[in-house]
Design a protein with these regions (language model features):
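Conserved catalytic core of the tyrosine transesterase superfamily
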Residues: 1-225
């Protein structure tokens, strides 16, 4: 009962279900393996996780977002995210040599699962990147360096820029830099691109990670009907 009360108190503090389940697992391990006390999963159940569909912007909303970004560096970064489906951290760690103009591809090296991959470089994105490159001193190492330190930008910096652009463009407040990756995948799904190809472009090891975009795509089609 004390553990149940503790977890309920943490829930009232605003902790998410995933965090509460981590608390639950740690306490359960301590009870079973250290104190050798039976654990009652009925009295202290695990929290049910909410599986919310990701926020997806329409093509016109993407245009409004990019138009709302004044700094060409951040406009280029957001364009890369939508054009390629790259994760925020992957775009931050891009280097000049990762951009292949001849093949219209981007070499993604610093990945979440440590597996290199190639993804799409659209003509529109290349045009924005080219404008950025000439206007910002033609960087040859880190493609999007911090202008003060020359090092990598932080995720929080991009999130701040995104929040301002979202407000200026009057887009859904739930839109984050990562939703550009969601939008990329969903739009490909709606265009009929095979799921395996989308999985490869996104760098998903598990096909189930890609299936969420099928659900979002179906939801969009229902809205059209």
């Amino acid at each position: 009962q004390d553990v149940r009360a503790f977890l309920l108190a943490k829930k009232e503090e605003g902790l998410k279900a995933t965090t509460l389940n981590l608390y639950n697992s740690a306490i359960r391990f301590f009870y079973r393996n250290v104190l050798h006390i039976l654990w009652d999963d009925i009295t202290v159940p695990r929290m049910i996780l909410e599986h919310k569909l990701p926020t997806v912007l329409t093509a016109s909303e993407i245009d409004r977002l990019l138009d709302a970004v004044d700094d060409i560096k951040y406009k280029a970064m957001f364009a890369v995210m939508y054009s390629s489906g790259m994760r925020v951290s992957e775009v931050i760690h891009l280097h000049y040599d990762d951009i292949s103009r001849s093949n219209m591809q981007i070499h993604v090296r610093d990945t979440k699962n440590r597996m290199d991959r190639y993804t799409i470089l659209s003509k529109r994105c290349l045009d924005i990147l080219t404008q950025y490159w000439f206007e910002k001193g033609r960087p040859r190492g880190i493609l999007f360096p911090n202008k003060f330190t020359g090092n990598y930008l932080t995720v929080s910096t991009l999130e701040q820029v995104m929040r301002r652009a979202v407000a200026d463009a009057e887009l859904p407040k739930t839109a984050t830099p990562h939703c550009l990756r969601h939008s990329f995948a969903t739009h490909l799904m709606e265009q009929g691109i095979e799921r395996q190809n989308i999985q490869a472009l996104l760098g998903h090891r598990d096909p189930k990670s890609t299936e969420v975009y099928l659900h979002v795509s179906n939801k969009s089609l229902i809205g059209i009907q």
